[in-house]
From Swiss-Prot:
One of its GO terms (cellular component) is ribonucleoprotein complex. PANTHER family: 40S RIBOSOMAL PROTEIN S25. Belongs to the eukaryotic ribosomal protein eS25 family. It comes from the Eukaryota. Residues 28-37 have a biased composition (Basic residues). This is Small ribosomal subunit protein eS25. The gene is RpS25. Keywords: Ribonucleoprotein, Ribosomal protein. Gene3D superfamilies: 3.30.63.20. Residues 1-42 are annotated as: Disordered.
């Protein structure tokens, strides 16, 4: 019997080269790029009240349904510490009513006509 020709080996080689071209290998995956983080604009809030802002505080803030230092700071463009002190002043004059005080967060609401000023 003559030796058989190795038909399997010759058939395998072309397939290997084709597989490399198709799948481009299962080695390293493409490296993920770092995303550019979101950039916030710097807040330039007032440190002291000027006349128009102070009048706005007395006119508009007592009409808000939910009053917190953060809300006042954002709407009137004043610092948080200034907003805190302003709300204490409004509460003492009876224009707003304190609802909750928990650690650093204080929540006020508008004073209704039937309420007595809270001391």
């Amino acid at each position: 019997m003559p030796p058989k020709k190795d038909t399997k080996a010759s058939a395998k080689q072309p397939q290997k080269t084709q597989k490399k071209k198709e799948g481009s290998g299962g080695g390293k995956a493409k490296k993920k790029k770092w995303s550019k983080g979101k950039v916030r604009d710097k807040l330039n809030n007032q440190v002291l009240f000027d006349k128009p802002t102070y009048e706005k505080l007395y006119k508009e803030v007592p009409q808000y349904k939910l009053i917190t230092p953060a809300v006042v700071s954002e709407r009137l463009k004043v610092r948080g510490s200034l907003a805190r002190r302003a709300l204490i002043e409004l509460r003492e004059k009876g224009l707003i009513k304190q609802v909750v005080q928990h650690h650093g967060q204080v929540i006020y609401t508008r004073a209704t006509k039937g309420d007595d000023p809270v001391a």
